[in-house]
Amino acid sequence: MAKELRFNSDARARLEQGVNALADAVKVTLGPKGRNAILEKLTGPPTITNDGVTIAREIQLRDPFANMGAQLVKEVAMKTNGVVGDGTTTATVLAQAMVREGLAAVEAGANPMRVRRGIERTVPVVVESLRSHSVEVGSSSDLRRIAALAASDDEAIGDVIAAAVEHVGKTGVVTTEESDTLGMAVDVVDGIEFDHGYTSGYMVTDPERMEAVLDNPLILLTNKKISQVQEIMPTLEVAKRADRPLVVIAEDVDGPALQLLVGGNMHKTMQSVVVRAPGFGHRRVAELEDLAVALGGHVIAKDTGIDLGEVAREHLGSCDRLTATESDTTIVGPRGHQNLVDARVAQLEVQRERARIDADRDILDLRIARLTGRVAVIRVGGATSVELKERMLRVEDALAATRAALEAGIVSGGGTALAQAHRVLDAVELVGDEAIGRDVVRRALSEPLRWIAFNAGFEGGDVVDVVADLPLGHGFNALTGEYGDMFEEGIIDPFKVTRAALESAASIAALLITTETAVVEEILGQPGAIMAPGFGDLAEGMVRPSNIY
């Protein structure tokens, strides 16, 4: 198949067009006075949001070269969202600034590889500076402010999330659900979470959030690999007779067995989801036994003497609700006997006291927390479906920011921490084109503050100049238009979010700066159609593969 190519400055310019198109659409949402974007949906009402990653997901450009640039910046937003769940707009703004400054330096004759090396050597210095100035979350008011700021300064969301986190503590789990009411409420229920998710995307029940949510399921627990239909059929028959969905938590499910389960979901004859069992090696059976006690079931394994062909109803666990994503699983309302759970926790606490290795103690702490933890469910409502979706996105952003703050502390917010981080760069001794890479980072650090001020109706450049000379931690309050101590005014950002945004942006910018060739499929026939050997013009008007994220 023929390809279309662009080289050198032409390739970089076309890629930069895509970077700018996506970043310009996203950065207007930055800050407490950021604007909204309205996104068309082919079915249902449009979505109104100021969530950076949600906007980025919707952007595809007609020019395939520019579209590649847009998709790379989309990767910045997606990666940041995947790591911390917030900070996507900041990451996009930083990436655009680094690409702009870096490409300008390359076009002026700088060696792109040395510029890249300068960026890669500078960013860790900035991260360590931010880490050294971060402080632990000290009170519920800090949690409330972090959540409110991440939700576009919505105090109601801040109050709800702070209440949820206080209920469950640092080791607890907080989830969100849509509600039929107009407001928001917090329900605290018994629950368990572990870090493995579903094995097949065909089993999701909510394609928009890519989650599989099953109410009142039966749960099979096994450390075996299931491949054959006859191995899973007895369990399926039990679930079918009970008219309940099935969750399979196993080492792996593949082959005909997986095809049978996926087919049941696709034809809506049997709802099920396969989740990879937690733990590794010899610890897997132990962690499955923890789940069996909590869920009121049994582990199907050689050690227990129960075979997959002998599974009956009493061998299966159950719960009120199970939610699985690609990376983790949350079980709400496990139905095991509390006296057995208490006995299991006591047994694990004895093992922890006898453990001599820190790693073993950490794993036992996690298992104890999993069995004793609670789950807070934030129920979010709205007057219309559009308002509900917009509020859900802000609640999820705020929840992610709060978790990040609890995990790694907070820094001064409103773009202040990044804008003042340039002070440590004078000590970074680089020469030649590597020094240019350092200056690329230096100039990009002030870009989030510039756009926060601009979106609030102020001259961004003037604000950046003033904040650069203020004492450390003092910055610009975009709501009042005044300068002050960011911590005292409650304008704070999670360190983990700020770090993830900077590192993701620098990674993509360094790749774009060193690009010399861009290759896309040649457009033939109708715009958007592609040619395939032996098939001719495929699906006239079909979206190009390069446009699909």
Swiss-Prot record:
Q: What is its main location?
A: cytoplasm
Q: What is this protein called?
A: Chaperonin-like protein MimG
Pfam families membership = Cpn60_TCP1 (PF00118)
Biological processes per GO annotation: protein refolding
Q: Does the keyword Chaperone apply?
A: yes
Task: Give its localization.
Answer: Cytoplasm
Instruction: Keyword check for Oxidoreductase, yes or no.
Output: no
Report the GO molecular function annotations.
ATP binding; ATP-dependent protein folding chaperone
Q: What does this protein do?
A: Plays an essential role in the productive folding of MimA and MimC, and thus in the formation of the active MimABCD complex.
The family note in this entry says: Belongs to the chaperonin (HSP60) family.
Q: Which GO cellular component term is one of those annotated?
A: cytoplasm
Supply the InterPro entries for this chain.
Answer: Cpn60/GroEL, Cpn60/GroEL/TCP-1, GroEL-like_apical_dom_sf, GROEL-like_equatorial_sf, TCP-1-like_intermed_sf
Mind listing the UniProt keywords for this protein, alphabetically?
Chaperone, Cytoplasm
